[in-house]
A protein has these predicted regions:
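Base-recognition residues in the alpha-helical recognition helix of bacterial helix-turn-helix
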Residues: 21, 46-49, 61
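Short linear capping/connector segments at secondary-structure termini
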Residues: 102-111
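Short alpha-helical scaffolding segments that buttress acidic/His motifs in well-ordered protein cores
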Residues: 87-90, 152-155, 176
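C-terminal peripheral helix-coil segments that are non-catalytic and often amphipathic
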Residues: 124-139, 161-186
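Short hydrophobic/aromatic patch on the recognition helix
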Residues: 38-48
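Basic, helix-initiating cap at the start of DNA-binding domains
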Residues: 1-23, 27-36, 53-56
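Hydrophobic alpha-helical connector segments
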Residues: 57, 68-96, 110-114
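Hydrophobic/aromatic residues within well-ordered alpha-helical segments
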Residues: 8, 58, 62, 66, ...
């Protein structure tokens, strides 16, 4: 892909991600996405022939960003802090991408290739960070990544259905993290 085409692709993904977050995956205008990206609608359709293709690309891009964040955190930092930082990133992803995820599942089904690939990226990242945190004694040994991901989805659902408290997700995640720490013997 030419350099200008790559830049346009990246700008379209960024604009679409913002529009889907603000307006919902079904209601965001493709013309508005193209305008925000600073390209014509024809450029949008050359990269993404359908709304579904754009949805898939945005979802995959966001999952890859979570994986990249996990890789950064695995390479540096204290294991417990790295684990908590990534869970906060996962809460943000889950909270802002709920309509996108719902649209993907409704259109493709939860077992589609793109959903499976993205779920695997997220779960593999969670497994790696969790194992490192458990080895360091920062997280209880009986915790698994499936439960963690479900807890995060629960936090995002609560914050979606009870808006108006911007600190709620962080407080809930702090409670979860406190519960994940090993308890003193006694």
């Amino acid at each position: 892909m030419r350099a200008d085409a790559q830049r346009n692709y990246a700008k379209l993904l960024s604009a679409a991600s913002a529009a889907f977050t603000e307006s919902g995956a079904d209601d965001a205008s493709l013309e508005e996405i193209a305008r925000r990206a600073g390209v014509g609608i024809g450029t949008l359709y050359r990269h993404f022939p359908t709304r579904q293709a754009l949805l898939e690309a945005v979802y995959r891009d966001q999952a890859e960003q979570l994986r990249a964040r996990a890789d950064e955190l695995l390479a540096s930092g204290e294991p417990g802090e790295a684990f908590a930082s990534w869970l906060r990133a996962l809460v943000a992803f889950s909270s802002t991408k709920r309509s996108l995820t719902s649209a993907m599942v409704a259109t493709l089904g939860k077992d589609s290739e793109v959903m499976s690939t993205c779920s695997k990226l997220i779960k593999d990242s969670a497994n790696a960070l969790l194992a490192r945190a458990q080895e360091a004694g920062a997280v209880r040994a009986d915790v698994n990544s499936t439960d963690l991901i479900r807890l995060v989805h629960g936090v995002s659902m609560v914050t979606e259905y009870a808006p108006g408290d911007p600190g709620q997700a962080d407080r809930m995640l702090t409670l979860i993290l406190d519960g994940l720490r090993p308890q003193p013997a006694g």
